[in-house]
Amino acid sequence: MTNKEAFSEAKKFIAGGVNSPVRAFGSVGGEPIIIDHGKGAYIYDIEGKKYLDFIQSWGPLIFGHCDADIEKAVIEAVKKGLSFGAPTLVETTLAKILCEKFENLDKIRFVSSGTEATMSAIRVARGYSKKDGLIKFEGCYHGHSDALLIKAGSGATTYGNASSGGVPQDVVRNTYLAVYNDAASVEAIFESNPGKIGAVIIEPIAGNMGLVPADKEFLQSLRALCDKFGAVLILDEVMSGFRASEFGSLPYHGILADLVTFGKVIGGGMNAAAFGGKREIMDCLSPDGAVYQAGTLSGNPIAMSAGIAALSKINASKNLYAKLENLARRLMQGFKAAANEADIALQTNVRGSMFGYFFTPHAVKNYDDALKSDTRLFAKFHAAMLKRGVYLAPSQFETGFVCEPMSEADIDFAVNAAREAFKEIKRNG
């Protein structure tokens, strides 16, 4: 069966043929490849073609596909049972690893997805602050819960407008949109809505408008504004946690949030996420407090075991993040040089093992900047790279990832492919 035939079959039974929209390649044209298996830095489709994988399951696989230690931990856990819906030792072990690593994590709670983590963090923040208003930022993605599926109105201080069908306007009326990397837009919302804002949520390193890091001074201003107006500051580190560094985004700004969300890497490739923070906030959760949150598979032993194996490897690894950042920078420097040779404008960003690139001559600091990127050119580049065995995120507004099994030779292979791709694009127009 070919990729095309398999995708056609999938569309008969799965809505859109995929279980997450970006996988359909709608942003870049063409049709997706259908994956058969992965090993290390590479994936293989059902036609037997090999690709250097810079998606790595959208971030979780920092040690690549089929890591032996994580695989062993999962197999041993499966032998004991898939799920119990009851407390186990492994969930406490993983919770302890996380709480001991981050000084602002007094307690945490596990869930099964990043969407659940951010949704639950917002709920407990509102329960603690006794205020319903939430500030989020244009271009920041925090999962697909209704209150967060919004776009900006006529200005940063307006109510959000539902940007997905099926989301009632009443659900998003307490969500306010601010401009990323613009503290003045946040202060204006606080000032014009006295006593209403209970929480601010932000990706300190945005990953779904492409990779766009928040400025240190901007995040410090957010901390000060939340303190001044009595709002809970939530850092969404579902993507950046254990990806930007061993301590997530913290080394880049130094601020301590009231709540933090995690996902992806902490599950070692399995379905695990978490939210946690100050004791007085987390104690608002049921059964100790009045804020309800629950989940059948939350803290399931398979995901917890995979997470323990992944974080234990991280803790035992020397120079892991230095290696990964060097690879990511080598890749982006190579892409930029190749683009320059073809007289194509390209902006790049790197944070640890995360990278992003934009087809625009201007620096990208916020969502409006990101939208100026040439998505038509991106689509051509993506197709040209896929043809050459390099699997990049099929959207201008996603982040790429390197992994530990990758070598400089792998990066150079991708850079050479980019050089050929840019020449092809320039030649064909």
From Swiss-Prot:
Top EC group: isomerase
CDD domains found in the cross-reference section: OAT_like
InterPro entries, per the entry: 4pyrrol_synth_GluAld_NH2Trfase (IPR004639), Aminotrans_3 (IPR005814), Aminotrans_3_PPA_site (IPR049704), PyrdxlP-dep_Trfase (IPR015424), PyrdxlP-dep_Trfase_major (IPR015421), PyrdxlP-dep_Trfase_small (IPR015422)
Residues modified to N6-(pyridoxal phosphate)lysine: 264
Cofactor(s) it depends on: pyridoxal 5'-phosphate
Gene Ontology biological process terms, A to Z: protoporphyrinogen IX biosynthetic process
Keyword Isomerase: yes
Keywords: Cytoplasm, Isomerase, Porphyrin biosynthesis, Pyridoxal phosphate
EC assignment: 5.4.3.8
Gene Ontology cellular component annotations, sorted alphabetically: cytoplasm
Catalytic activity, as annotated: (S)-4-amino-5-oxopentanoate = 5-aminolevulinate
Pathway: Porphyrin-containing compound metabolism; protoporphyrin-IX biosynthesis; 5-aminolevulinate from L-glutamyl-tRNA(Glu): step 2/2
Cellular location(s): Cytoplasm
Entries under PROSITE patterns matching the protein: AA_TRANSFER_CLASS_3
The organism's place on the tree of life at top rank: Bacteria
GO molecular function: glutamate-1-semialdehyde 2,1-aminomutase activity; pyridoxal phosphate binding; transaminase activity
Subunit note: Homodimer.
Protein family: Belongs to the class-III pyridoxal-phosphate-dependent aminotransferase family. HemL subfamily.
Name recorded for this polypeptide: Glutamate-1-semialdehyde 2,1-aminomutase
